[in-house]
């Protein structure tokens, strides 16, 4: 079992490479999907150069766990919170490292109604599953879908 040091008390943040990469992003998505079993969630990412590739890997993990993914594309954390609540989906994940240096990236996770997921509300469980990396085989009949959407007009209004 690999210890993932990118898991912090309230979110996920790590230096790109060994602490956070596409494989780890996939495992986080898969763990989120297997633990919370959401039907549909929204994802997005900030302007960092690595956010898009991490978001793609994250979405793949979610879909492999049977979760339908709505990708709002370039976004801020507050837009993920808005979209999660506005669309009435089961959760959301923003790929962002906030104020950390450019060689870092991370994720902020929420449940339904945009309730933040932190150490005492599910983040440790997601971490454990991602570290164990012992997921069931992907069932093609159960695999989730990916759809690109925009909530920018509704968010701005």
Curated annotation (Swiss-Prot):
The keyword Phosphoprotein applies. It catalyses: alpha-D-mannose 1-phosphate = D-mannose 6-phosphate. Keywords: Capsule biogenesis/degradation, Isomerase, Lipopolysaccharide biosynthesis, Magnesium, Metal-binding, Phosphoprotein. GO terms for biological process: capsule polysaccharide biosynthetic process; GDP-mannose biosynthetic process; lipopolysaccharide biosynthetic process. Binds 1 Mg(2+) ion per subunit. Pathway: Nucleotide-sugar biosynthesis; GDP-alpha-D-mannose biosynthesis; alpha-D-mannose 1-phosphate from D-fructose 6-phosphate: step 2/2; Capsule biogenesis; capsule polysaccharide biosynthesis. Its EC number is 5.4.2.8. One of its GO terms (molecular function) is phosphomannomutase activity. The active site is at residue 98. SUPFAM superfamilies: Phosphoglucomutase, first 3 domains. Mg(2+) binds at residue 98. Its cofactor is Mg(2+). Gene3D superfamilies: Alpha-D-Glucose-1,6-Bisphosphate, subunit A, domain 3. It holds the Pfam family PGM_PMM_I. Involved in the biosynthesis of the K2 capsular polysaccharide biosynthesis. Belongs to the phosphohexose mutase family. This is Phosphomannomutase. It comes from Klebsiella pneumoniae. The gene is manB.
């Amino acid at each position: 079992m690999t210890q993932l040091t990118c898991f912090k008390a309230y979110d996920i943040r790590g230096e790109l490479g060994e602490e956070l990469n596409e494989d780890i992003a996939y495992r986080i998505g898969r763990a989120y999907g297997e633990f919370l079993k959401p039907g549909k969630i929204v994802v997005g990412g900030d302007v960092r150069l690595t956010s898009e590739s991490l978001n793609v890997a994250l979405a793949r993990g979610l879909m492999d766990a049977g979760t339908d993914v709505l990708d709002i594309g370039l976004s801020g954390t507050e837009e993920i919170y808005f979209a999660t609540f506005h669309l009435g989906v089961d959760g959301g994940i923003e790929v962002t490292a906030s104020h950390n240096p450019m060689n870092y990236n991370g994720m902020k996770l929420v449940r339904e109604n945009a309730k933040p997921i932190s150490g005492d509300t599910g983040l440790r469980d997601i971490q454990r599953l991602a570290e164990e990396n012992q997921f069931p085989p992907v069932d093609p009949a159960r695999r989730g879908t990916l759809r690109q959407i925009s909530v920018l007009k509704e968010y701005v209004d």
